[in-house]
Each structure stands twice: as C-alpha cells, then as structure tokens.
C-alpha cells in the first residue's frame, strides 16, 4: 500500500556519468529535468515498531516513481525558491517554496557518480535520478495525486488498487 507521496525534481541522463565526475561533467550528462511523484510504500507488518532510519524512502520503502514530461531548462534558475505543491483528489495538501538549487543538484550527482559506481551501480544514459522530496504528505485514501512545479510543469497519477 502506498502511504506517502513526495513531489520531487528529477534529471534524466543522456550520457553515462562515471565515478569522480565533476559538476561540469554532471551538467553535461543531463538530458532533461522532470517533475516526479515518488510513492512510498509500507513493506513492514508493524511500521510503527521500526526505527526512523529504516523508514527512509530511498531503497527501503520506495514503491513507485511516476515521471512527468520534461520541463524547460529555464527552471534551473528558480529551483531554490520554486513553488511546489502536492494535491490529493484536486485539493492542495502540501506546498513549499524552497529546495535544492541547481548547483546543489549537480553536487549531489557528482557525489552519486562515485557512490553508485562503488556499489556496482554506475549512473547510465537513460537513468532518471530523483533529487529529494520537496512537498510530501501521507496519502490517506486519496486516489488522484498531482505534483506541480510552479508554472513549469506537473505530474499526476491515479491509484486504482
């Protein structure tokens, strides 16, 4: 069961990003920027009994990623103060106006290039990399989920089960 929705900014790679890549190489490897919904699932019988570290979304409770259409690269200049909203069933449930700026995202990609390669999971052309939750909230029984990245673009999905 999907229990939390997170609205994120993601990048899609057009080229492999080898270990040790600097910021310029990271930027050159990016094909496009996308709005994304990360759906956090609950793999635990008793979620409340788990440690906070174990409840982190990435690689532990990630249930699905929904990737929206690419947005214009002009979004890069606004990322630090970008209004981002998460809507459930047509009503805004959470919104923020802050997040990682473009340089922060490039630094994270540079770091991730080495970290991923060290784990045998190099960053390859075509990979979509999420860059951290901006707006997030427990889903409850909501069926329609939408994420809005200011005036730049949106992503949505419908829960059917």
Q: What do the predicted segments below correspond to?
A:
Residues 105-140:
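A conserved acidic, glycine/proline-rich C-terminal tail/linker
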Residues 1-103, 110, 138, 144, ...:
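Catalytic-core "active-site belt" of small-molecule-metabolizing enzymes
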């Amino acid at each position: 069961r999907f229990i939390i929705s997170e609205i994120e900014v993601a990048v899609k790679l057009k080229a492999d990003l080898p270990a040790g890549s600097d910021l310029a190489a990271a930027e050159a490897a990016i094909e496009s920027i996308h709005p994304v919904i990360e759906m956090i699932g609950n793999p635990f019988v008793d979620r409340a009994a788990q440690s906070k570290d174990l409840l982190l979304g990435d690689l532990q409770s990630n249930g699905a990623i929904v990737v929206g259409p690419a947005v214009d690269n002009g979004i890069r200049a606004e990322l630090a103060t970008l209004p981002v909203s998460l809507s459930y069933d047509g009503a805004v449930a959470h919104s923020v106006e802050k997040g990682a700026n473009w340089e922060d995202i490039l630094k994270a990609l540079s770091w991730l290039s080495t970290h991923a390669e060290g784990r045998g999971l190099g960053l390859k052309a075509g990979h979509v990399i999420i860059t951290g939750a901006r707006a997030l909230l427990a889903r409850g029984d909501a069926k329609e989920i939408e994420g809005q990245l200011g005036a730049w673009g949106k992503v949505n999905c419908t829960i059917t089960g």
